[in-house]
């Protein structure tokens, strides 16, 4: 309490003077002109170093330690502590508004404990990235909110962390989960831009190359096979026993000249290589100063980026230090690098925040929402009216407590049909769903059984659609807005939690990026002789849903589960919407 009063008094003095306050409860500010701090380490400062903003002072120091072991240099360090006047978002705004493309660093690292102003972070991060910057960030404290109980599939899957994930994707920020990963991603940013996903691994030791190839493949990058006359020619220039299939293993007795030859072939002769990763430690068979000099020259000459993995930081400490002193970074662990690189390459570019209005009747959406009497779950007819206003195709259905009317409808749409109870929200929990009803007697039996269940006011009948089940949902997060989720339905969403997140409103680019980042995407595309689904229509529905949400902030939770992809197109079969007014 006393500390809070002193903090407020300090802020009042600063505001009266028209000054800026960083902190309190922080290690302060360091840059090329000033590092009057009481902590260690103080890194080297260079104009082309990294700008680093941290919520925590202690963590900032540990991140600097991790960066220094890689040869990463700094341009400025900001520790915002309690953020009484300026938080991480405010420092980013300052950097964006005063950005000088010639003088300022283009690499930003963020360690964030709380996102108080998501809109500000989104706006200035994406603005800086569009100006040519690259941003990597850790958002700490990502699991606590996930423990909250929630009533829908969407609520159970979408924690506050999904909002962070969606925000970072929309802004184009590379999300990291540890100090080591953050400083590895920032080190990747210092190298030449990666133009593709095809990686060549050049090594003199088999094991690390295999582990690196595994890490790259898991991260959806390619380690293409190198074969044919060009590969044979390269093999003829190396010692017997060398392998060139990728990894290119020049073996333990390989010389600096062999390394140079392998790099030249990857740069000039192999068209299916976009970047090179060179693993070279100290087997004690060649002079490492000579080898690292070759690597230094090739990194300057080559147009394709080269990632140096020099693992012998103890045995070859002086040689590695000498290499780093020439302005290079070093990745001592190949798997950390492979994982970090996949994060960089799989992070989309900043997305448009324009709203796609096509196909959504916004006045009708508002009329429906404004007419609703209060908070809670909407009844099936209200849900259908709202989805119709957003032009989301619905399965034909009929709800009634009149047995004969239900039988007539089932006859019209043709068996098999599905019957569901009207009333309770969680129908399947009370046995209120019957699938694959093949005839009149079966439907009558289910009608009699279901009408006796507690809280049931009627029965809904739908044709039984055949096709791939998809899932679509949304959840409102304070300050962030609506997080939209998409994925394959059934086991994929419930057990495997294979979902993608986006922040409404969604552009088509962002929506396609969400769909294609799903682990189950090959099923959407069509795999093993099975026909794919209409990806364009799925994207249309997701975009329209995000527009609907943008104009109906009262919707706090919703899911369409399943959305069935049939030969005739996609249809929403079951949907739930909860509003708060």
Question: Model regions: which residues?
Answer:
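Catalytic-core regions of core metabolic enzymes
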Residues: 1-581
């Amino acid at each position: 309490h006393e500390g809070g009063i002193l903090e407020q008094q300090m802020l009042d003095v600063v505001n009266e003077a028209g000054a800026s306050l960083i902190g309190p409860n922080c290690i302060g500010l360091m840059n090329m002109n000033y590092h009057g701090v009481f902590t260690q380490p103080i890194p080297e400062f260079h104009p082309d170093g990294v700008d680093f903003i941290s919520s925590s002072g202690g963590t900032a120091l540990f991140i600097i330690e991790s960066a220094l072991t890689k040869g990463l240099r700094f341009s400025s360090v900001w520790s915002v502590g309690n953020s009484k006047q300026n938080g991480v978002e405010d420092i980013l705004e300052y950097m964006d508004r005063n950005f000088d493309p010639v003088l300022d660093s283009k690499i930003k690292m963020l360690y964030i404990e709380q996102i108080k102003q998501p809109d500000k972070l989104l706006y200035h991060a994406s603005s800086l990235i569009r100006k040519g910057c690259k941003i990597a960030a850790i958002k700490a404290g990502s699991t606590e909110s996930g423990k909250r109980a929630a009533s829908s599939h969407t609520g159970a899957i979408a924690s506050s962390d999904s909002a962070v994930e969606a925000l970072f994707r929309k802004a184009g920020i590379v999300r990291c989960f540890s100090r080591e990963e953050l400083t590895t991603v920032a080190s990747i940013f210092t190298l030449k831009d990666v133009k593709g996903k095809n990686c060549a691994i050049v090594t003199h030791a088999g094991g690390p190359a295999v582990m690196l190839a595994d890490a790259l493949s898991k991260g959806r990058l390619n380690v293409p096979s190198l074969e044919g006359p060009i590969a044979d020619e390269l093999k003829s220039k190396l010692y017997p026993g060398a392998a060139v299939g990728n990894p290119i293993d020049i073996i333990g007795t390989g010389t600096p000249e062999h390394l140079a030859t392998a790099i030249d072939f990857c740069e000039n002769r192999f068209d299916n290589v976009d970047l090179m990763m060179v693993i070279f430690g100290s087997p004690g068979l060649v002079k490492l100063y000579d080898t690292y000099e070759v690597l230094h020259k090739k990194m300057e000459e080559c147009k394709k980026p080269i990632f140096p993995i020099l693992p012998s930081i103890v045995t070859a400490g002086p040689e590695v230090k000498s290499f780093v002193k020439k302005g290079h970074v070093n990745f001592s662990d190949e798997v950390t690098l492979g994982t970090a690189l996949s994060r960089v390459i799989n992070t989309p570019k900043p997305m448009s925040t324009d709203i796609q209005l096509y196909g959504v009747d916004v006045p009708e959406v508002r009329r429906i929402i404004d007419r609703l009497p209060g908070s809670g779950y909407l009844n099936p007819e209200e849900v259908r009216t709202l989805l119709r206003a957003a032009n989301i195709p619905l399965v034909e259905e009929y709800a009634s407590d009149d047995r004969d009317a239900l039988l007539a409808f089932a006859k019209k749409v043709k068996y098999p049909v599905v019957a569901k109870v009207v009333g309770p929200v969680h129908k399947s929990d009370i046995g209120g769903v019957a699938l694959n009803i093949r005839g009149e007697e079966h439907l009558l039996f289910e009608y009699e059984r279901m009408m006796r269940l507690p809280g049931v006011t009627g029965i809904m009948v739908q044709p039984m659609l055949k096709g791939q089940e998809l899932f679509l949902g949304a959840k409102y997060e304070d300050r962030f807005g609506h997080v939209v989720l998409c994925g394959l339905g059934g086991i994929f969403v419930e057990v495997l939690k294979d979902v993608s997140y986006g922040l409404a409103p969604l552009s088509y680019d962002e929506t396609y990026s969400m769909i294609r980042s799903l682990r189950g995407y090959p099923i959407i595309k069509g795999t093993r002789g099975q026909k794919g689904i209409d990806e364009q229509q799925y994207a249309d529905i997701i975009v329209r849903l995000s527009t609907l949400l943008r104009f109906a902030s009262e919707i706090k939770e919703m899911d369409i589960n399943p959305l069935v992809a049939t030969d005739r197109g996609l249809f929403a079969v079951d949907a739930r919407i909860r509003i708060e007014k």
